[in-house]
UniProtKB/Swiss-Prot annotation:
Name of the protein in its database record: Chaperone protein DnaK
Stretches that traverse the bilayer: none
Gene Ontology MF, one: ATP-dependent protein folding chaperone
Keyword DNA-binding attached: no
Organism of this sequence: Mycoplasmopsis pulmonis (strain UAB CTIP) (Mycoplasma pulmonis)
One Pfam family in the UniProt entry: HSP70
Protein's job: Acts as a chaperone.
Amino acid sequence: MAKEIILGIDLGTTNSVVSIIENKKPVVLENFNGKRTTPSVVAFKNGEIQVGEIAKRQLETNPDTIASIKRLMGTTKTVKANGKTYKPEEISAMILSHLKEYAEKKVGKKLTKAVITVPAYFDNSQREATKIAGKIAGLDVLRIINEPTAAALSFGLDKKEKEMKVLVYDLGGGTFDVSVLELENGTFEVLSTSGDNHLGGDDWDHVIVEWLTKEIKNRYDFDPSKDKMVMTRLKEAAEKAKIDLSAQMVAQITLPFLSVTSKGPINVDLELKRSEFEKMTTHLVDRTRKPIEDALREAKIKASDLSEVLLVGGSTRIPAVQSMVEHVLGKKPNRSINPDEVVAIGAAIQGGVLAGDINDVLLLDVTPLTLGIETLGGVATPLIPRNTTIPVTKSQVFSTAADNQSEVTISVVQGERPMASDNKQLGQFNLSGIEPAPRGVPQIEVSFSIDVNGITTVKAKDLKTNKEQEITIKNSSKLSDEEVEKMVKEAEENREADKAKKEKVEVIVRAESLISQLEKSLVDQGDKVDAKAKEETQKQIQELKDLIKDDKIEELKVKLEQIEQAAQAFAQYSAQQAATENSKDSDTVEAEIVDDKAN
């Protein structure tokens, strides 16, 4: 295993995945349920924070359940649950804490460092928000890397000697990216990236939900949109139908007792054909065409120059998506990678590079959007064009717009529009103390620096007086350092409380499982057990039940150890008795061996 384990995390809209480097090879870790993907869902129940599959199952019944929080990262929007208001970073931190916890259990040690992936088209605020979420979860986020880049890293790790150009088409649950990379001698250079931060598998689900709502209205004279719980069931059914239609031509949608009206219960039984589904979602598939064309154009290559086309993200399993990609690029996509896991694996590889476990790999990523400042007339003047390789620093000299101007305001913008007001303002600051002079005379140097995580720092310097001012562009949700520290502290406190609750639940579940096993054994094998052993087992079952009822967890742990040993002996005895009965009618070798042990 690595000298220093750095987690590779794909923090997805729908699902999240964790990977590490083990013996110089990436390994995807299983969660507490033995699954390799974890739903990015958080639920609050009885004062406990629940994450993953257990939370997803509550989407239908628990209003304090939050999904698809990634869509709100980097915004000022909040969500309400559990009687409180949460920022997106806090909810994402709960997901990251859960991933960190099960990773620590798997490797048997505390883990504090991570590489986290984000959509290539995430802006500065969204990247900063992701780092803050990691910090709240107790993680030092060493790198933020783009999801398509991570996928290419994973695909190309064993092809370092080859020279190839790869297009990565990444359609996740809530975001869409296309990146073109060049792989040569272990260097992974991103040539271009394009995409849509508001397009993903959720949108395909939404189309089916709209269809279901309309069909139910027409066929059953019932409007499901007026019932939140019913709509949650429709969303779950829509996701299942979408998945089914990736493998079969018809999806059967059955929703028994969807609701009850004056006419009686509503039992929905509908059929959705793949051809109908494809017709309904043509506009969504078509929205992914232009980013493909843009990425190729900006990389200055033709589709015929591509060595490989990689499909990443669970939504790329949709047949219409695969057909469109093949049609537009004239090349069959490579299906050798797992679209759900490849991004986390790439993040782990980058972690392995940082830890020194993987050598001869260099990642050169790009900034997805143009960065610049607002100049006279509200014009957005670019300093760093989109698809510039990072890390990078660029400078340009500007001047004053009025005579004797003693102060200038630097407004930093991100986007491709010519006017500053049409782009996203990332922040602003003032440079004061400029010596009086006619307009156009003072020389003010503005420098932009983008680090390996895509985080931007802007400096302004008066070249005559050497006075300077700088700003590191922070998350647009404007979380102060104090707020972040408070969240870190709260998360740590909750982590201990949640851990205690979780351990308590695990002990109770273990005890209830044992009770069930013992009671079943008494029913199945009771007539073959002597009265004393049977009475002792019944007594132990009652003791377990009493300890659970009285909430005596520590005593329950001790009693469990004792009874589990007794249960094992009971099971062996039952097996021996059963074998003895069988031996009366059989001369098999196996029976003779059991008889020998019994004597």
